[in-house]
């Protein structure tokens, strides 16, 4: 079964349930036979920490890890020769950071990647990337009065300390990194949405960036989750509540509206329109009228 009880990702890969774990690689469950199949570093995974899994329209399977991103050509997981690992080094910096947190496919088959160092795109064998200097994430001066998390990760992590130094943020002693994309989504119009660590929500139309923060109506500037419902509406899970975006404005839901906790990490919409919202400590089921 699972090689780790820490779970980052649960989704579908064909008819099977795919689980990305914390230190235990990627596991797949066949619901009919109840048989598990596990893939880890010996099978080709870049890392045992798996944050997201995407099956592209062309059949390729992409796996986001903390040591780069795997691409399995044609989705043939059992054929080791089909496995590729793309890292900062192998892409000559096309992938801006090896810590990959999210994957999404665009309208034309391009693959978008959320990393701890910015946004990347893989299209027809070519890489592009965007970071805070190019428009990703709101500047510190715009969000500094609304940073709820005061503990600075760089004080306990050399990895985060190095990132802050590279960005020139040594004097910022709170949880803020606009290059760190925690959540990612691409809507039906091809707009890319990126949720950042303290820099709010960013919108990218392929040419220009727009930032949304507490000032524009978000409940919080740490954006942990992005969900597009069947109607195409964008839901934004933050450190301080859940927001529904419609016509450029945000409708906020908090514990007062039924959420278990205001820190929202996951969400899905059931067939009947019911919302299932995963938050710190529990899950809320919200029936929409």
Regions found by a protein language model. Give the residues of each.
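Carboxylate-rich, polar loop motifs that coordinate divalent cations or form catalytic acidic clusters
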Residues: 1-289
């Amino acid at each position: 079964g699972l090689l780790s009880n820490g779970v980052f990702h649960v989704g579908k890969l064909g008819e099977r349930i795919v689980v990305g774990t914390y230190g235990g690689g990627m596991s797949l469950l066949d619901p009919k036979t109840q048989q598990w199949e596990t893939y880890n570093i010996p099978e080709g995974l870049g890392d045992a920490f798996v944050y997201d899994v995407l099956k592209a329209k062309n059949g390729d399977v992409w796996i986001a890890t903390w040591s780069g991103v795997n691409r399995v050509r044609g989705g043939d997981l059992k054929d080791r020769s089909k496995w590729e690992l793309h890292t900062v080094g192998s892409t000559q910096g096309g992938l801006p950071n090896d810590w990959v947190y999210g994957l999404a496919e665009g309208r034309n088959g391009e693959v978008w990647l959320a990393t701890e160092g910015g946004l990347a795109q893989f299209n027809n064998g070519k890489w592009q990337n965007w970071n805070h200097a190019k428009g990703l994430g709101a500047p510190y001066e715009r969000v500094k009065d609304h940073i709820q998390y005061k503990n600075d990760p760089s004080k306990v992590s050399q990895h985060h300390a190095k990132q802050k130094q590279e960005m020139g943020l040594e004097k910022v002693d709170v949880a803020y990194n606009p290059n760190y994309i925690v959540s990612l989504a691409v809507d039906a119009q091809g707009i890319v949405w990126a949720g950042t660590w303290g820099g709010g929500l960013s919108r990218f139309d392929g040419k220009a960036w727009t930032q949304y923060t507490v000032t524009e109506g978000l409940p919080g500037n740490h954006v942990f989750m992005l969900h597009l419902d069947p109607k195409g509406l964008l839901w934004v899970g933050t450190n301080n509540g859940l927001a529904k975006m419609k016509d450029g404005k945000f409708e906020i839901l908090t514990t007062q509206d039924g959420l278990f906790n205001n820190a929202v990490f996951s969400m899905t919409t059931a067939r009947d329109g019911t919302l299932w919202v995963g938050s710190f400590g529990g899950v809320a089921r919200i029936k929409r009228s």
